[in-house]
Swiss-Prot record:
GO molecular function per UniProt: DNA binding
Compositionally biased intervals (Basic residues): 1-36
Residue segments, region Disordered: 1-44
GO terms (BP aspect): cell differentiation; spermatogenesis
Note: N-terminal half is highly basic, while C-terminal part is acid.
Name assigned to this protein: Spermatid-specific protein S2
Compartment(s) where it occurs, according to its Swiss-Prot or TrEMBL record: Nucleus; Chromosome
Gene Ontology CC entries for this record: nucleosome; nucleus
Organism annotation: Scyliorhinus canicula
Entry function: Involved in nuclear basic protein transition: histones are replaced by spermatid specific proteins which are themselves replaced by protamines in late spermatids.
Length: 80
């Protein structure tokens, strides 16, 4: 099959010739201005004492392991 528009099978037919415009330099978008009408309601983050944090972590780990054990027990019961 002979293509109607030579060497342009991959591109759609150009209907009207468009005038070439000069390239405009791209402008960086400005970051939006921060409007602060009132002080933010967020409470300041108070750093926990390291020891307290560690205690919390150990408790969390213990709970996790207990939950895992219970899950396994339940799953074993199901299979029996």
């Amino acid at each position: 099959v002979k293509s109607r528009y030579h060497q342009r099978q991959y591109r759609a037919r150009k209907r009207y010739a468009k005038a070439r415009r000069t390239k405009k330099p791209k402008r960086r978008p400005k970051p939006p201005r921060k409007l602060r009408y009132a002080p933010s309601k967020k409470q300041p983050k108070i750093m926990k004492l390291k020891l307290d944090n560690e205690v919390d972590n150990t408790l969390k780990a213990k709970n996790k392991s207990l939950n895992e054990a219970l899950k396994n027990r339940l799953s074993l019961r199901k299979h029996v």
